[in-house]
Amino acid sequence: TTASRETLRKQAAWLRKNSKVTIVLEGHADERGTREYNLALGERRANAAKDYLMTYGISSDRISVLSYGKERPVDSGSNPLAWSKNRRSVTVKAN
């Protein structure tokens, strides 16, 4: 989404100013689908964010990717709104 790209652009700007910082991009999925499918989906989601940050000059060796699939929902509901909240990538400062 446009908002997601703007968030990543801001993160890239911050990371360029803080060149010693490394991050972990966590990929998440909603509850639908198998565990294996959602782990792969979460990984693709996190890798898409990584690729986007790299287009802004952030080195791949500063970015780790981790998928939680459907294991860590932010909304425990079982409806379209909850599912949309749970499909996400989260950036975590690693050091």
Give names to the regions the model predicted:
Residues 1-10, 30-35:
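Short, solvent-exposed beta-strand/turn patches at coil↔beta or beta↔helix junctions
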Residues 28-95:
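Periplasmic OmpA-like peptidoglycan-binding domain that tethers envelope proteins to the cell wall
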Residues 21:
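A conserved beta-turn-beta hairpin within the catalytic core of GNAT-like acetyltransferases
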Residues 16-17:
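Structural recognition of beta-strand segments within beta-rich domains
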